[in-house]
Protein backbone atom coordinates (compact mmCIF):
# COMPACT_ATOMS: atom_id res chain seq x y z
CA UNK A 1 0.00 0.00 0.00
CA UNK A 2 1.32 3.44 -0.92
CA UNK A 3 1.42 5.86 2.01
CA UNK A 4 2.53 9.47 2.23
CA UNK A 5 3.79 11.40 5.25
CA UNK A 6 1.96 14.68 5.84
CA UNK A 7 2.24 17.34 8.52
CA UNK A 8 -1.37 17.07 9.74
CA UNK A 9 -3.19 13.89 8.78
CA UNK A 10 -6.19 14.84 10.96
CA UNK A 11 -7.50 17.25 8.33
CA UNK A 12 -8.04 14.46 5.79
CA UNK A 13 -10.77 11.83 5.48
CA UNK A 14 -10.92 8.42 3.82
CA UNK A 15 -12.45 8.70 0.35
CA UNK A 16 -11.38 12.29 -0.27
CA UNK A 17 -9.84 13.18 -3.61
CA UNK A 18 -6.47 14.91 -3.43
CA UNK A 19 -3.90 16.49 -5.73
CA UNK A 20 -0.28 15.73 -4.91
CA UNK A 21 2.30 17.99 -6.53
CA UNK A 22 6.02 17.27 -6.63
CA UNK A 23 8.08 20.38 -7.42
CA UNK A 24 10.94 20.42 -9.90
CA UNK A 25 13.48 22.31 -7.82
CA UNK A 26 16.84 23.70 -8.85
CA UNK A 27 18.61 21.13 -6.66
CA UNK A 28 16.76 18.21 -8.26
CA UNK A 29 17.50 19.47 -11.76
CA UNK A 30 21.19 19.87 -10.94
CA UNK A 31 21.34 16.35 -9.49
CA UNK A 32 19.93 14.99 -12.75
CA UNK A 33 22.43 17.14 -14.67
CA UNK A 34 19.66 18.45 -16.88
CA UNK A 35 20.28 22.14 -16.15
CA UNK A 36 22.62 22.27 -19.16
CA UNK A 37 23.12 19.92 -22.09
CA UNK A 38 26.35 21.38 -23.45
CA UNK A 39 27.07 22.70 -26.90
CA UNK A 40 26.81 26.30 -25.77
CA UNK A 41 23.02 26.15 -25.74
CA UNK A 42 21.49 27.04 -22.36
CA UNK A 43 17.87 27.42 -23.46
CA UNK A 44 17.37 23.66 -23.40
CA UNK A 45 18.34 23.32 -19.75
CA UNK A 46 15.51 22.48 -17.39
CA UNK A 47 14.28 25.36 -15.25
CA UNK A 48 12.73 25.18 -11.76
CA UNK A 49 8.96 24.61 -11.73
CA UNK A 50 8.87 23.67 -15.41
CA UNK A 51 8.60 19.94 -14.72
CA UNK A 52 6.35 19.71 -11.69
CA UNK A 53 4.35 16.48 -11.50
CA UNK A 54 0.73 16.45 -10.27
CA UNK A 55 -1.11 13.25 -9.40
CA UNK A 56 -4.78 12.67 -8.65
CA UNK A 57 -5.34 10.16 -5.90
CA UNK A 58 -7.96 8.96 -3.42
CA UNK A 59 -7.27 8.54 0.30
CA UNK A 60 -7.84 4.94 1.39
CA UNK A 61 -6.56 5.08 4.97
CA UNK A 62 -5.46 7.57 7.63
CA UNK A 63 -2.51 6.65 9.85
CA UNK A 64 -0.69 8.38 12.67
CA UNK A 65 2.10 9.35 10.29
CA UNK A 66 0.16 10.23 7.18
CA UNK A 67 -2.29 9.09 4.52
CA UNK A 68 -2.47 6.03 2.27
CA UNK A 69 -3.33 6.23 -1.42
CA UNK A 70 -5.26 4.08 -3.87
CA UNK A 71 -2.44 4.22 -6.46
CA UNK A 72 1.32 4.58 -5.80
CA UNK A 73 3.19 7.69 -6.93
CA UNK A 74 5.55 7.33 -9.87
CA UNK A 75 8.26 9.73 -8.67
CA UNK A 76 9.23 9.92 -5.00
CA UNK A 77 8.38 13.25 -3.29
CA UNK A 78 11.83 13.45 -1.70
CA UNK A 79 12.25 15.98 1.11
CA UNK A 80 15.76 16.66 -0.19
CA UNK A 81 14.21 18.22 -3.28
CA UNK A 82 11.31 20.14 -1.81
CA UNK A 83 9.03 17.19 -0.88
CA UNK A 84 5.66 18.30 -2.23
CA UNK A 85 2.19 19.56 -1.44
CA UNK A 86 -1.19 17.90 -0.92
CA UNK A 87 -4.51 19.63 -1.61
CA UNK A 88 -8.08 18.36 -1.39
CA UNK A 89 -10.26 19.03 -4.41
CA UNK A 90 -13.66 18.45 -5.97
CA UNK A 91 -14.38 18.33 -9.69
CA UNK A 92 -18.08 18.93 -10.08
CA UNK A 93 -19.39 18.12 -13.53
CA UNK A 94 -16.44 16.04 -14.62
CA UNK A 95 -17.47 13.45 -17.20
CA UNK A 96 -17.13 9.84 -16.04
CA UNK A 97 -18.28 6.33 -16.90
CA UNK A 98 -18.33 7.00 -20.63
CA UNK A 99 -17.16 4.88 -23.55
CA UNK A 100 -16.70 5.02 -27.31
CA UNK A 101 -16.82 1.66 -29.02
CA UNK A 102 -17.66 -0.40 -32.10
CA UNK A 103 -17.04 2.34 -34.67
CA UNK A 104 -15.17 2.84 -37.93
CA UNK A 105 -13.74 6.37 -38.25
CA UNK A 106 -12.20 7.62 -41.48
CA UNK A 107 -10.84 11.04 -42.43
CA UNK A 108 -11.62 12.25 -45.96
CA UNK A 109 -8.61 13.75 -47.75
CA UNK A 110 -7.42 14.88 -51.18
CA UNK A 111 -6.65 11.57 -52.87
CA UNK A 112 -4.40 13.39 -55.35
CA UNK A 113 -2.10 14.44 -52.50
CA UNK A 114 -0.68 11.51 -50.49
CA UNK A 115 0.66 13.99 -47.90
CA UNK A 116 -2.47 16.10 -47.60
CA UNK A 117 -2.90 17.79 -44.21
CA UNK A 118 -6.05 19.78 -44.89
CA UNK A 119 -8.28 17.19 -43.28
CA UNK A 120 -9.04 15.73 -39.87
CA UNK A 121 -6.06 15.40 -37.50
CA UNK A 122 -7.59 14.00 -34.30
CA UNK A 123 -10.13 11.21 -34.21
CA UNK A 124 -10.89 10.89 -30.49
CA UNK A 125 -9.70 13.26 -27.76
CA UNK A 126 -10.30 12.61 -24.07
CA UNK A 127 -10.24 15.69 -21.81
CA UNK A 128 -11.65 16.43 -18.34
CA UNK A 129 -12.78 12.83 -18.04
CA UNK A 130 -12.42 9.94 -15.60
CA UNK A 131 -13.17 6.22 -15.88
CA UNK A 132 -13.58 6.20 -19.66
CA UNK A 133 -12.77 3.81 -22.47
CA UNK A 134 -12.30 3.46 -26.22
CA UNK A 135 -12.84 -0.04 -27.56
CA UNK A 136 -12.98 -1.80 -30.92
CA UNK A 137 -12.56 1.26 -33.13
CA UNK A 138 -11.04 1.15 -36.64
CA UNK A 139 -9.24 4.36 -37.70
CA UNK A 140 -8.05 5.35 -41.18
CA UNK A 141 -6.21 8.32 -42.72
CA UNK A 142 -5.91 10.62 -39.67
CA UNK A 143 -2.97 13.05 -39.72
CA UNK A 144 -2.38 13.38 -35.98
CA UNK A 145 -3.56 11.14 -33.14
CA UNK A 146 -6.38 8.64 -33.44
CA UNK A 147 -6.67 8.59 -29.63
CA UNK A 148 -5.27 11.48 -27.59
CA UNK A 149 -5.60 11.29 -23.80
CA UNK A 150 -4.99 14.76 -22.40
CA UNK A 151 -3.45 15.66 -19.03
CA UNK A 152 -6.86 16.25 -17.46
CA UNK A 153 -7.95 12.65 -18.12
CA UNK A 154 -7.44 9.69 -15.79
CA UNK A 155 -8.42 6.03 -15.54
CA UNK A 156 -8.78 5.51 -19.29
CA UNK A 157 -8.63 2.19 -21.17
CA UNK A 158 -8.05 1.98 -24.93
CA UNK A 159 -8.24 -1.55 -26.29
CA UNK A 160 -8.67 -3.63 -29.43
CA UNK A 161 -8.21 -0.68 -31.81
CA UNK A 162 -6.46 -0.44 -35.18
CA UNK A 163 -5.03 2.52 -37.11
CA UNK A 164 -3.97 2.23 -40.75
CA UNK A 165 -3.11 4.38 -43.78
CA UNK A 166 -2.42 7.73 -42.08
CA UNK A 167 -2.22 10.71 -44.44
CA UNK A 168 0.15 13.59 -43.61
CA UNK A 169 3.66 14.89 -44.01
CA UNK A 170 6.31 12.87 -42.18
CA UNK A 171 7.60 14.90 -39.24
CA UNK A 172 7.11 16.23 -35.74
CA UNK A 173 3.62 16.62 -34.22
CA UNK A 174 2.18 14.27 -36.82
CA UNK A 175 1.10 10.65 -36.50
CA UNK A 176 1.40 10.43 -32.71
CA UNK A 177 -1.07 7.64 -33.20
CA UNK A 178 -1.98 6.51 -29.68
CA UNK A 179 -0.80 9.31 -27.40
CA UNK A 180 -1.28 9.97 -23.68
CA UNK A 181 -0.51 12.92 -21.45
CA UNK A 182 -2.84 11.56 -18.78
CA UNK A 183 -2.49 9.26 -15.80
CA UNK A 184 -3.66 5.74 -15.05
CA UNK A 185 -4.18 4.98 -18.73
CA UNK A 186 -3.98 1.54 -20.32
CA UNK A 187 -3.57 0.81 -24.03
CA UNK A 188 -3.89 -2.89 -24.79
CA UNK A 189 -4.11 -5.01 -27.93
CA UNK A 190 -3.49 -2.04 -30.24
CA UNK A 191 -2.26 -2.20 -33.85
CA UNK A 192 -0.88 0.75 -35.84
CA UNK A 193 0.79 1.16 -39.22
CA UNK A 194 3.09 3.84 -40.67
CA UNK A 195 2.84 6.23 -37.77
CA UNK A 196 5.55 8.52 -36.44
CA UNK A 197 5.34 7.86 -32.70
CA UNK A 198 2.68 5.15 -32.73
CA UNK A 199 2.66 4.55 -28.96
CA UNK A 200 3.69 7.71 -27.14
CA UNK A 201 3.74 9.25 -23.67
CA UNK A 202 4.04 13.02 -23.49
CA UNK A 203 5.51 15.84 -21.43
CA UNK A 204 5.57 15.19 -17.67
CA UNK A 205 2.76 12.64 -17.90
CA UNK A 206 2.12 11.76 -14.26
CA UNK A 207 1.39 8.08 -14.83
CA UNK A 208 1.22 5.27 -14.34
CA UNK A 209 0.62 4.65 -18.04
CA UNK A 210 0.91 1.30 -19.81
CA UNK A 211 1.00 -0.13 -23.33
CA UNK A 212 0.42 -3.90 -23.31
CA UNK A 213 0.33 -6.34 -26.25
CA UNK A 214 0.63 -3.65 -28.90
CA UNK A 215 2.16 -3.75 -32.38
CA UNK A 216 3.55 -0.93 -34.51
CA UNK A 217 4.31 -1.86 -38.12
CA UNK A 218 6.89 0.11 -40.12
CA UNK A 219 6.71 3.40 -38.21
CA UNK A 220 8.81 6.39 -39.24
CA UNK A 221 10.14 6.93 -35.73
CA UNK A 222 10.29 5.35 -32.30
CA UNK A 223 7.62 4.60 -29.70
CA UNK A 224 8.11 5.60 -26.07
CA UNK A 225 8.40 8.89 -24.22
CA UNK A 226 8.41 11.85 -26.59
CA UNK A 227 9.34 14.62 -24.18
CA UNK A 228 10.89 14.93 -20.71
CA UNK A 229 10.20 13.24 -17.37
CA UNK A 230 7.20 11.07 -18.09
CA UNK A 231 7.21 8.69 -15.11
CA UNK A 232 5.63 5.35 -14.33
CA UNK A 233 5.65 4.14 -17.95
CA UNK A 234 5.29 0.46 -18.86
CA UNK A 235 5.69 -1.16 -22.28
CA UNK A 236 4.95 -4.89 -22.01
CA UNK A 237 4.89 -7.25 -25.01
CA UNK A 238 5.12 -4.32 -27.42
CA UNK A 239 6.53 -4.98 -30.90
CA UNK A 240 7.85 -2.00 -32.88
CA UNK A 241 8.59 -3.51 -36.30
CA UNK A 242 11.16 -1.44 -38.16
CA UNK A 243 12.04 1.08 -35.46
CA UNK A 244 12.85 1.39 -31.77
CA UNK A 245 11.36 1.62 -28.32
CA UNK A 246 13.03 4.60 -26.68
CA UNK A 247 12.96 6.67 -23.51
CA UNK A 248 14.76 9.98 -23.93
CA UNK A 249 14.70 13.72 -23.35
CA UNK A 250 13.40 14.18 -26.87
CA UNK A 251 13.18 17.98 -26.93
CA UNK A 252 16.97 18.27 -26.67
CA UNK A 253 17.54 16.27 -29.84
CA UNK A 254 14.79 18.06 -31.77
CA UNK A 255 16.20 21.47 -30.83
CA UNK A 256 19.75 20.52 -31.80
CA UNK A 257 18.46 19.19 -35.13
CA UNK A 258 16.62 22.46 -35.77
CA UNK A 259 19.77 24.46 -35.02
CA UNK A 260 21.82 22.32 -37.41
CA UNK A 261 19.23 22.70 -40.17
CA UNK A 262 19.18 26.47 -39.69
CA UNK A 263 22.98 26.66 -39.92
CA UNK A 264 22.94 24.50 -43.03
CA UNK A 265 20.32 26.67 -44.74
CA UNK A 266 22.23 29.84 -43.89
PLM segments and residue spans:
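Parallel beta-helix/beta-solenoid
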Residues: 1, 5-6, 10-22, 92-111, ...
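Surface-exposed or flexible loop/turn and strand-edge residues in extracellular/cell-surface modules
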Residues: 1, 54-56, 95, 121, ...
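Autoprocessing Asn-cyclization modules and mimics
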Residues: 1-54, 62, 68-70, 76
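Extracellular beta-strand solenoids
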Residues: 6, 61, 69, 105, ...
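Ligand-binding pocket scaffold of soluble enzyme catalytic domains
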Residues: 53, 120, 149, 266
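Extracellular beta-strand/beta-solenoid scaffold signature
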Residues: 80-90, 114-125, 141-145, 170-179, ...
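Right-handed parallel beta-helix
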Residues: 96-107, 130-141, 153-168, 181-197, ...
Amino acid sequence: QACLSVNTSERYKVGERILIQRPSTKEWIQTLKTDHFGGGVTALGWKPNQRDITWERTITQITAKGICLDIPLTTAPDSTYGAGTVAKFQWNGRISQIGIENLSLESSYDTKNPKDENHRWMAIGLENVSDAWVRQVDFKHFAGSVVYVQASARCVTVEDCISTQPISEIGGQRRYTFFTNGQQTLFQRIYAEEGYHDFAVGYCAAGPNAFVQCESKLPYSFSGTVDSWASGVLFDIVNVDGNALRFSNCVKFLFHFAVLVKKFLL
